[in-house]
């Protein structure tokens, strides 16, 4: 027990206290607390430390053979004793992050209604569109400072999961706490239940969501607007993170709200920031700059285009023109290279088309240039996959790239593992160990010709917890593009490969707290510089970040009057 930490005064006692995950200590309640909070007889006699509890919990965790059972077990601890949950996860972060988030969370979302045990967060149905204020007032946590919200339409690479998408905000906020030190008392996961177009969900008798085709058009837009206004009335300073919205809604929602409220979209901006940070590290390791690269994307959705725009902005910051930077970025989707004159492109895709003058001398058997055609003609040095289509980084494609680039940078970022464009093992073999690889899902190190290559996971968890920590520590009112660019720069400075010439592109997850604090500092400094937070000294800023950083330790309790 941490007696040096001031006590917490609480009104709960007896079974009600044991049923409150944020406050429950289980067998760690002291003799005095058991007496004054009417817990005597409700717990076994032994009084244990959190270390003893964690040891038991980890042993139980290891007894489960498959990842889904492990996920369910950890979620049960989270819904019973949050302090113990976060101590356990932090003690085994590399082992458990793939269980509480990608890739296991994908299966958890698909099976959400089947494995449902207990409600967490808020389910805001379109049927309650006129009562959103009332629903927000029902939240278990009332001092909310960060919200992760989804409508469940584009869950990872798995598509429309309806309310099953709630697994993503729950998992994301668990990482805000485990990686970024955001107190779980300040978090709120929300799913906007606007129906589902997934026939499997609608036909499933176990499905717990609103059984209705998805609301679209102005009705959908107005519903989201009412939600945002209600959040602003209830928690005007809360950071809102949009998560796993479909392509047709993700970018428009971000554009509509980014200058009105403190918000960001992790799929677009967080993925872009961690990718740019990883690219900066890879460029340093390869002895070049990002502005010198030619970048090809497979996947031209909102996430891919968001990453591309972030790369272009970084290139421009390194001294080249916007037009030159755009000429070095090639977007390929199912119809081939995005080019001038292509029909049915979305606004954010139009900004990334290749001009005819840039491809007039290209050689191809087809008018629509394939990924291989781009490899052959553009001779890119960077290849990024955000397609959600497995296996499209073929041996032919990778080896064509390697012909023109000694150290190709290859990032197959699609999640979950089953959707990855190519495995690190194949990429390393096809390039004889020369490729610099980062993936979206976790992969084991690759051994080739007697050398071991650690594979960096280009995981948004390296970025968004630090952004959240920086924003909340200084009460920033916006999340700007410049703040996100600072997060990328700070991440790149943590790269073992860039710093030491060996190791992975990104630091091990065991260093995530150090990384998050570094990113928080960089993001907060930029927010202050841009006028989005009150000015303070660097020393005071670092102190604020340290003070805000929540740690999973049990506090002493004293009882207040009811």
From Swiss-Prot:
Pfam family, one: Malic_M
Keywords: Metal-binding, NAD, Oxidoreductase
Cross-referenced PROSITE patterns: MALIC_ENZYMES (PS00331)
Positions that bind NAD(+): 154, 267, 415
Positions of transmembrane segments: none
One GO cellular component term noted in the UniProt record for this chain: cytosol
Binding site for a divalent metal cation: 243-244, 267
GO biological process: malate metabolic process
Keyword field contains Metal-binding: yes
Active site: 101 (proton donor), 172 (proton acceptor)
InterPro entries membership: Aminoacid_DH-like_N_sf, Malic_enzyme_CS, Malic_N_dom, Malic_N_dom_sf, Malic_NAD-bd, Malic_OxRdtase, NAD(P)-bd_dom_sf, NAD_malic_enz_proteobac
Annotated site residues (Important for activity) in this chain: 267
Root EC class: oxidoreductase
Enzyme Commission identifier(s): 1.1.1.38
Cofactor binding, per record: Divalent metal cations. Prefers magnesium or manganese.
GO molecular function terms attached to this record: malate dehydrogenase (decarboxylating) (NAD+) activity; metal ion binding; NAD binding; oxaloacetate decarboxylase activity
Catalysis performed (reactions): (S)-malate + NAD(+) = pyruvate + CO2 + NADH; oxaloacetate + H(+) = pyruvate + CO2
Gene3D superfamilies the record matches: Malic enzyme, N-terminal domain, NAD(P)-binding Rossmann-like Domain
Subunit description: Homotetramer.
Family: Belongs to the malic enzymes family.
Protein name as catalogued: NAD-dependent malic enzyme
Protein's organism: Aliivibrio salmonicida (strain LFI1238) (Vibrio salmonicida (strain LFI1238))
Biological classification of the source: Bacteria, Pseudomonadati, Pseudomonadota, Gammaproteobacteria, Vibrionales
